[in-house]
């Protein structure tokens, strides 16, 4: 017990989205991980649902908080003092927390680690995807492109505020004072393209998942593959079914199980009927526990994404079950797959190549083993804790060099 009290106290900062998402799960998992290892893990959170209850004046004040929030600054400083915080770990800050959290921590002499879940520092809509295609106009031509296309929440006014805030804090070199966690090396390289952040301040640390209780031997699995995700064009669901027509008509014998709902669901049903596909099953929404069990019974998880993705947890969940992943060679998702080792990759725009890739599963026992080995080495809770502590230690050491007493 005495050793646990010596662990650095951490303040986790997060602005919860109106629709719960993967970032919320990551915050909860990291809090539990820290507490399991004896850290005091305090929370400073806001919730975007607060906006719907605000009056006009409060909404104006909260919008200005994208530049600097006095409330955030005061409350975070108070929390650091009251909880004797050694390090502040930030996740999402928009729109209610804002960059003031960084200045509050730095004013208290406490280092800041920012997990980068998306591309918001480079792209106001955070996903590098617009109007049905990948878009990096803001990095190549300037942030004004986002205003033209109303990229933040579909609002020109809100996009203007987001762009002005980003430009202000770039000019103030706010972002150069932080330490960063990116979830993949692909994301790290995108972040460093900003040319404001020292490369030594950016570390790669993926998310983690708990392993399944049992693993089904690859040879004993059902003759099926599974898609788990939103039925949306940017997720590649149309490309997948177009590939499946080729696969099924060429004599392929596997079954495709599709788990999820979304705007393309009606199209999927109509397409299955029109093309008379017999080996495809639409299951609709499937809870995570059932989806993971299904992955563990299947020959592969298919991820035909058409955008860069953030960090698809389904990939790590598949690895934990020794399930290979067939994935488009694109962005963060593609960077997580080692072709022929943990899964198979195909060109993101080629239904023909995806259909051909399915045939590689006939001899994938070694790939199943490679997926499990990769999970055990990189994506367990214990591996994640070691990675996290190395990042925290580096951040606190550099902070101590600037302000020795503040890291005690």
Model-identified regions with their sequence ranges:
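Conserved acidic donor-binding segment of nucleotide-sugar-dependent glycosyltransferases
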Residues: 339-340, 344-351, 359-365
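Acidic donor-binding loop of glycosyltransferase active sites
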Residues: 296-310, 323
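Membrane-proximal helix-turn-helix segments that form the acceptor-binding/catalytic region
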Residues: 107, 135-180
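Short hydrophobic beta-strand element within catalytic cores of glycosyltransferases
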Residues: 315, 324-327
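Nucleotide-activated donor-binding/catalytic signature segment of Leloir-type glycosyltransferases, i.e.
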Residues: 269-289
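A conserved mid-protein helix/loop that constitutes part of the nucleotide-sugar donor-binding site
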Residues: 24-25, 223, 227-246, 263-269, ...
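Carbohydrate-associated surface elements
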Residues: 186, 208
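A short, well-ordered alpha-helix in the C-terminal region of glycosyltransferases
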Residues: 365-390
């Amino acid at each position: 017990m005495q050793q646990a009290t010596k662990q650095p106290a951490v303040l986790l900062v997060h602005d919860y989205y109106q629709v719960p998402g993967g970032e919320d799960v990551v915050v909860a998992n990291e809090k539990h991980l820290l507490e399991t290892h004896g850290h005091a893990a305090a929370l400073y959170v806001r919730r975007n649902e607060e906006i719907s209850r605000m009056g006009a004046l409060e909404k104006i004040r909260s919008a200005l908080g994208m530049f600097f929030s006095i409330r955030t600054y005061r409350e975070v400083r108070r929390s650091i003092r009251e909880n004797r915080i050694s390090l502040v770990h930030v996740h999402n800050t928009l729109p209610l927390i804002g960059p003031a959290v960084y200045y509050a921590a730095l004013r208290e002499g406490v280092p800041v680690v920012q997990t980068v879940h998306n591309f918001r520092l480079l792209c106001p809509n955070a996903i590098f995807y617009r109007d049905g295609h990948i878009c990096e106009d803001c990095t190549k031509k300037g942030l004004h492109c986002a205003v033209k296309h109303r990229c933040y929440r579909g609002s020109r006014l809100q996009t203007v505020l987001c762009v002005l805030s980003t430009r202000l804090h770039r000019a103030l070199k706010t972002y150069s004072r932080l330490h960063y966690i990116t979830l993949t090396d692909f994301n790290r390289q995108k972040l460093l393209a900003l040319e404001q952040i020292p490369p030594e301040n950016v570390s790669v640390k993926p998310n983690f998942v708990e392993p399944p209780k049992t693993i089904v031997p690859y040879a004993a699995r059902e003759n099926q593959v599974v898609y788990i995700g939103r039925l949306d064009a940017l997720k590649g669901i149309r490309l997948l079914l177009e590939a499946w027509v080729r696969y099924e008509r060429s004599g392929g014998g596997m079954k495709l199980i599709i788990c999820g709902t979304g705007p393309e669901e009606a199209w999927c049903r109509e397409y299955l009927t029109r093309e008379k596909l017999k080996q495809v099953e639409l299951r609709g929404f499937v809870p995570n526990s059932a989806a993971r069990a299904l992955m563990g019974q299947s020959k592969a998880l298919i991820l035909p994404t058409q955008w860069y993705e953030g960090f698809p947890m389904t990939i790590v969940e598949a690895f934990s079950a020794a399930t290979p992943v067939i994935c488009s060679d694109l962005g963060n998702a593609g960077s997580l797959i080692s072709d022929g080792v943990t899964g198979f990759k195909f060109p993101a725009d080629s239904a023909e190549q995806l259909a051909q890739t399915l045939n590689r599963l006939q001899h994938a026992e070694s790939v199943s083993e490679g997926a499990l080995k990769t999970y055990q080495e990189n994506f367990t809770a214990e591996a994640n804790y070691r990675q996290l502590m190395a990042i925290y230690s580096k951040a606190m050491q550099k902070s101590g060099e600037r302000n020795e007493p503040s890291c005690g």
